[in-house]
């Protein structure tokens, strides 16, 4: 297994003054669609071994079967049109065709095949497969849709250093690689991220509103002159209704007694990577029911008694089966004192096999 920290360029929150400065310097901005997918880093070394990794350098469970040698990568590396003979990393957004974000990200994080996902498996099963059968889930690559942001020489990735290629040139590098990827891996839908050039802040706002109306999450605004940096750095900015943060589940949030959601799990206490503890709620009724039933089953199995609020002077009796799970929350804004407005639970970030390890 390749021991590498991909640490891709990650956009920071929208900062109008910084964006205006980049606009004044370059004369325009590059605005790309912000896709609802799973950030993926595909590393290919000079021996034609590939590694399909998440943005935190963990193997993506549903794509683990793609790791290792593939003669098609060898042919691509030997193609005269390939500028990266010593290996490269593709940085992009991984999506599953024909399904929404939550379904797609769930499939990519899935470890075991069952009746809910076997139609997406690379093999055709005649009989229903159950999770207890322990059949590894292998996503058929025909279901994969990949939007590419960048391509980096592998030695730069391994060094941990920034890649000294400006955004405006990186787009051309991606366009040069696309025909090779489409030729050697035609079953995968490869595309460059949809991008636009805007020449003032009014035009940027109009584009943002247009893409939101089309159903997209928002935009990634990029400084054309900024090189590809490693990690969460200024030069790429998220333009979307909310910000997000990662954290670890510490507890359950129960609905208020006497109100409609009494007796239901309405969210989680989450310890953010910043060290702040928040109550992340605002989940669907379907998730409330799912989480509540899971907690109830775990508690009854352990104690034979379930009481989310306690009875009389007795404390509540519940077990949190989600304790320690990695997750992502969203929030409207951060106040000057560091607290978050309207934190909401978005999704689990761990894998099915290890929910406590962020993917």
From Swiss-Prot:
The signal peptide annotation in the UniProt record is none
Protein residues bound to a divalent metal cation:
217
Q: Which PANTHER family does the UniProt record give? A: DNA LIGASE, DNA LIGASE B
- Native species: Escherichia phage T7 (Bacteriophage T7)
Source superkingdom: Viruses
Query: What, per the annotation, is the impact of changing residue 238 to A?
Result: Complete loss of transadenylation activity
The family classification in the record reads:
Belongs to the ATP-dependent DNA ligase family.
Query: What GO molecular function terms would the record report?
Result: ATP binding; DNA ligase (ATP) activity; double-stranded DNA binding; metal ion binding
Catalytic reaction(s) noted = ATP + (deoxyribonucleotide)n-3'-hydroxyl + 5'-phospho-(deoxyribonucleotide)m = (deoxyribonucleotide)n+m + AMP + diphosphate
Question: Record's PROSITE patterns?
Answer: DNA_LIGASE_A1 (PS00697), DNA_LIGASE_A2 (PS00333), DNA_LIGASE_A3 (PS50160)
Ordered alphabetically, the record's keywords are: ATP-binding, DNA damage, DNA recombination, DNA repair, DNA replication, DNA-binding, Ligase, Metal-binding, Nucleotide-binding
Concerning Pfam families, the annotation shows: DNA_ligase_A_M, DNA_ligase_C
Q: Which EC numbers does the record give?
A: 6.5.1.1
A single BP term in Gene Ontology: DNA repair
Q: What is this protein called?
A: DNA ligase
Q: What function does this protein fulfil?
A: DNA ligase that seals nicks in double-stranded DNA during DNA replication, DNA recombination and DNA repair in an ATP-dependent reaction. Binds specifically to DNA nicks containing a 3'-OH and a 5'-phosphate group.
The cofactors required by this protein are: a divalent metal cation
Q: EC top class, in one word?
A: ligase
Q: Which residues bind ATP?
A: 32-35, 39, 55-57, 93, 232, 238
Which residues does UniProt mark as catalytic?
34
């Amino acid at each position: 297994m390749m021991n590498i920290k991909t640490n891709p360029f990650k956009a920071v929150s929208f900062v109008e003054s910084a964006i205006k400065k980049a606009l004044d310097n370059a004369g325009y901005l590059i605005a790309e669609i912000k896709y609802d997918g799973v950030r993926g880093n595909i590393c290919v070394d000079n021996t034609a071994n590939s590694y399909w990794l998440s943005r935190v350098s963990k193997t993506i469970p549903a794509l683990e079967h793609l790791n290792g040698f593939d003669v098609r990568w060898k042919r691509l590396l030997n193609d005269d049109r390939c500028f990266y003979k010593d290996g490269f990393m593709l940085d992009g957004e991984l999506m599953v065709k024909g399904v929404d974000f939550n379904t797609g990200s769930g499939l990519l994080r899935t470890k075991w095949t069952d009746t809910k996902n076997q139609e997406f498996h690379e093999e055709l099963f005649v009989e229903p497969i159950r999770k207890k059968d322990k059949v590894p889930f292998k996503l058929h690559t025909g279901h994969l849709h990949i939007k590419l942001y960048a391509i980096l020489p592998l030695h730069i990735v391994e060094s941990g250093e920034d890649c000294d290629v400006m955004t405006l040139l990186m787009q051309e590098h991606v366009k040069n690689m696309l025909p090779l990827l489409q030729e050697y891996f035609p079953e995968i839908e490869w595309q460059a991220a949809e991008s636009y050039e805007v020449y003032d802040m009014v035009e940027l706002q109009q584009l943002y509103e247009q893409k939101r109306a089309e159903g997209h999450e928002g935009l990634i605004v990029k400084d054309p002159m900024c090189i590809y940096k490693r990690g969460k750095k200024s030069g790429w900015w998220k333009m979307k209704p909310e910000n997000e943060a990662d954290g670890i589940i510490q507890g359950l949030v129960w609905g208020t007694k006497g109100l409609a959601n009494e007796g239901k799990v309405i969210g989680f206490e989450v310890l953010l990577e910043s060290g702040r503890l928040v109550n992340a709620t605002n989940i669907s009724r379907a998730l409330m029911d799912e989480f509540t039933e899971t907690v109830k089953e775990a508690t009854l199995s352990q104690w034979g008694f379930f009481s989310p609020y306690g009875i009389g002077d007795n404390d509540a009796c519940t077990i949190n089966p989600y304790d320690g799970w990695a997750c992502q929350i969203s929030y409207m804004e951060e106040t000057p004192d560091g607290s978050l407005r309207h934190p909401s639970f978005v999704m689990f970030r761990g894998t099915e096999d290890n929910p406590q390890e962020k993917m």
